[in-house]
From Swiss-Prot:
Signal peptide residues on this chain, from the entry's feature table: none
The species this protein was found in: Cenarchaeum symbiosum (strain A)
GO biological process, alphabetically ordered: tRNA nucleoside ribose methylation
Short name of any one Pfam family annotated for the protein: Trm56
Single GO molecular function: tRNA (cytidine(56)-2'-O)-methyltransferase activity
Organism superkingdom: Archaea
Protein name, UniProt field: tRNA (cytidine(56)-2'-O)-methyltransferase
InterPro entries according to UniProt: Alpha/beta_knot_MTases (IPR029028), tRNA_m1G_MTases_N (IPR029026), tRNA_mtfrase_aTrm56 (IPR002845)
Reactions mediated catalytically: cytidine(56) in tRNA + S-adenosyl-L-methionine = 2'-O-methylcytidine(56) in tRNA + S-adenosyl-L-homocysteine + H(+)
Keywords for this protein: Cytoplasm, Methyltransferase, S-adenosyl-L-methionine, Transferase, tRNA processing
GO cellular component: cytoplasm
Major localization listed first in the record, in broad terms: cytoplasm
Spans traversing the lipid bilayer: none
Family: Belongs to the aTrm56 family.
Length: 175
């Protein structure tokens, strides 16, 4: 399954950090790419550094128009808008696991009505207000049934050695 993420909107300066965290979650939880508009280019640089160190081919693509992206993906990917409205994740997840390509859409603020209409699925993550970061993490984990948590990258220069107590990071050249 190929998973991509679109983050719509950016609010003031505080959102550079939130945007970075949304992208880090997308990467760590198995997405291959995140699309963003109106974002500080340093966010892309941060993610490139993370991928260089921890491995993987995660891409950050800066776009001019989220509407144009959604229209271009219509028919080639299942567009899944993560929201507090819509059908529950429990009701939708079974059919979504059978899809070949998913574009998960998360919003930074009030999401324009177009998103609800362009989405193939409006999926409720809990029916309560919370962050787009938590919605994305829950969705990607449920979609992949936790398999992404044990995924490794052969090109990683650092790897965490799981331990019950303490911490240990293996450093070296990629395999």
């Amino acid at each position: 399954m190929r998973i991509e993420v679109l983050r719509i909107g950016q609010r003031a300066v505080r959102d550079d950090r939130v945007t970075t965290h949304a992208a880090l979650v997308a990467r760590a939880f198995g997405a291959e790419r995140i699309f963003m508009e109106e974002v500080n280019p340093q966010v892309r640089d941060t993610l490139a550094d993370v991928s260089s160190t921890w491995g993987g081919g995660f891409e950050v693509e800066l776009i001019d128009s989220w509407r144009a992206l959604l229209r271009s993906k219509k028919g080639s990917a299942s567009i899944v808008h993560l929201t507090m409205y819509g059908e529950t994740i429990d009701a939708a997840i079974g059919s979504l696991r059978r899809k070949e390509k998913i574009l998960a859409v998360v919003g930074a603020g009030k999401v324009p009505r177009d998103v609800y209409e362009l989405a193939d699925y409006n999926v409720s993550i809990g029916g309560q207000p919370h962050s787009e970061i938590s919605a994305l993490a829950v969705f990607l984990d449920r979609l992949q049934e936790g398999r992404q948590l044990s995924k490794g990258y052969g090109d990683a220069r650092r790897k965490v050695l799981p331990m019950r107590r303490g911490k240990h990071v293996l450093e070296g050249e990629p395999e």
